[in-house]
């Protein structure tokens, strides 16, 4: 027979690792082709000129130039100029 009472198990103690989403290059910053500009879930930012959209909605530079963020009709666009 146990000399001490058994303790209850905790239902806490879990946490998921962060996904490191967000803007990686700010407006006006120079980027080279292939650099990631935004990591996102869904199209929070839409693709503009000279940028590509990955299958996980990552926006990346297709050519070298300066990053430009602009809003048109309530949508945020990312372009390279």
From Swiss-Prot:
Entry annotated with the keyword rRNA-binding: no
Database matches in Pfam families: Ribosomal_L27
GO BP annotations listed: translation
Gene Ontology MF annotations: structural constituent of ribosome
UniProt key word Ribosomal protein: yes
Family assignment from sequence similarity: Belongs to the bacterial ribosomal protein bL27 family.
Listed name of the protein: Large ribosomal subunit protein bL27
Species of origin: Borreliella burgdorferi (strain ATCC 35210 / DSM 4680 / CIP 102532 / B31)
């Amino acid at each position: 027979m146990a000399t001490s009472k058994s303790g209850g198990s905790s239902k806490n103690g879990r946490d998921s690792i962060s996904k490191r989403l967000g803007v990686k290059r700010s407006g006006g910053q120079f980027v080279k082709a292939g650099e990631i500009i935004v990591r996102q879930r869904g199209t929070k930012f839409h693709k503009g000129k000279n940028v590509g959209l990955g299958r996980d909605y990552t926006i990346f530079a297709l050519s070298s130039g300066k990053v430009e963020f602009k809003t048109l009709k309530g949508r945020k666009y990312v372009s390279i100029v």
